[in-house]
Swiss-Prot record:
This is Digeranylgeranylglyceryl phosphate synthase. It is a multi-pass membrane protein. One of its GO terms (biological process) is glycerophospholipid biosynthetic process. InterPro entries: DGGGP_synth (IPR023547), Prenyltransferase_related (IPR050475), UbiA_prenyltransferase (IPR000537), UbiA_sf (IPR044878). One of its GO terms (cellular component) is plasma membrane. Its EC number is 2.5.1.42. PANTHER family: CHLOROPHYLL SYNTHASE, CHLOROPHYLL SYNTHASE, CHLOROPLASTIC. Prenyltransferase that catalyzes the transfer of the geranylgeranyl moiety of geranylgeranyl diphosphate (GGPP) to the C2 hydroxyl of (S)-3-O-geranylgeranylglyceryl phosphate (GGGP). This reaction is the second ether-bond-formation step in the biosynthesis of archaeal membrane lipids. Belongs to the UbiA prenyltransferase family. DGGGP synthase subfamily. The chain crosses the membrane at residues 16-36, 40-60, 77-99, 104-121, 124-144, 146-166, 192-212, 220-240, 259-279. The keyword Transmembrane helix applies. It catalyses: sn-3-O-(geranylgeranyl)glycerol 1-phosphate + (2E,6E,10E)-geranylgeranyl diphosphate = 2,3-bis-O-(geranylgeranyl)-sn-glycerol 1-phosphate + diphosphate. Keywords: Cell membrane, Lipid biosynthesis, Lipid metabolism, Magnesium, Membrane, Phospholipid biosynthesis, Phospholipid metabolism, Transferase, Transmembrane, Transmembrane helix.
């Protein structure tokens, strides 16, 4: 057993980003950074819940990851499945306890997300399109969680909408990328059931919908600091063009990585836009 695998299995960079997005949701809702204590609690809940989600996903994806991602801790034998399960449950449990310290709504929200992550990994992930929607929903509600923690939604609703739409697209492209491994395990993902070309077109539709949704905060009065969203929309549009031109697992893999970069830049745009509102 490798000690570093306890960090690696969390996918800490992703969890770090998720935690920051939770704080961003609160910031966008308020128009300024929340108190340090509140920010820390939001970050910890989201980081630990994200960690739980990654671990339980790897737990149930053990056989598939032997093909698609053999270097991850579980398939390479660096960590046993049972230890990983206990580890994940513990982290998720701590997240729920911390959420209770914020407010009751935040507690219920965290508990619901915890259960949905388990249900997704256990049952919903192999279901065509349903699994994609669940992941996108969990991603989209991250900024909403921060907003709920401070008792105000505000512009965080637009951030959540954009996050949901772009992550539906990204999850579809990831399924296209992983189609061979998923086929080997008998999964029924969207590209397996509907084909790569049709799935690519659906991913493009959600990509374009993201661009349209990204314009809504402008009408709602977000600050001038939101201007980098133009770059984000350009990346998404180019990614959509690429996958339409050559719908294939290789292209989908490249495109989903570009969308991930776009997501990071969008987070930055919303942050700048929220703190410059009214300037």
């Amino acid at each position: 057993m490798e000690l570093k695998c306890f960090i690696e299995i969390l996918r800490p960079i992703n969890c770090l980003i998720a935690g920051l997005v939770g704080i961003l949701g609160a910031t966008v809702a308020l128009g300024h950074l929340p108190p340090i204590k509140t920010s820390l609690l939001i970050f910890l809940v989201v980081f630990l819940e994200c960690s739980w989600g990654n671990i339980i996903n790897d737990y149930f994806d053990y056989e598939i990851d032997k093909i698609n991602r053999p270097n991850r801790p579980l398939p390479r034998g660096a960590l046993s499945k049972n230890i990983a399960l206990v580890y994940g449950i513990s982290l998720g449990g701590v997240a729920i306890l911390i959420a209770y310290l914020i407010n009751f709504e935040a507690f219920i929200f965290a508990l619901g997300a915890y259960l949905l992550m388990y249900l997704y990994a256990r049952k919903l992930k192999p279901q065509p399109f349903i699994g994609n929607l669940v992941v996108a929903t969990l991603t989209g509600i991250t900024p909403i969680y921060g907003a709920i923690a401070v008792g105000k939604i505000g512009l965080a609703g637009y951030l959540a909408l954009c996050a949901f739409l772009v992550n539906v697209a990204r999850e579809i492209f990831k399924d296209i990328e992983d189609i061979e491994g998923d086929k080997a395990q008998g999964a029924k993902t969207l590209p397996i059931v509907w084909g790569i070309e049709s799935s690519s077109k659906i991913g493009v539709i959600f990509s374009v919908a993201t661009i349209i949704a990204s314009l809504l905060p402008v009408k709602a009065g977000i600050g001038l600091g939101y201007f980098p969203i133009i770059i984000v929309d350009g990346i998404i549009l180019w990614a959509a063009y690429e996958v339409l031109k050559n719908p294939s697992p290789k292209t989908a893999g490249r495109v989903q990585k570009k969308l991930k970069i776009a997501i990071y830049l969008a987070v930055f745009s919303f942050l700048l836009g929220s703190i410059t509102k009214g300037v």
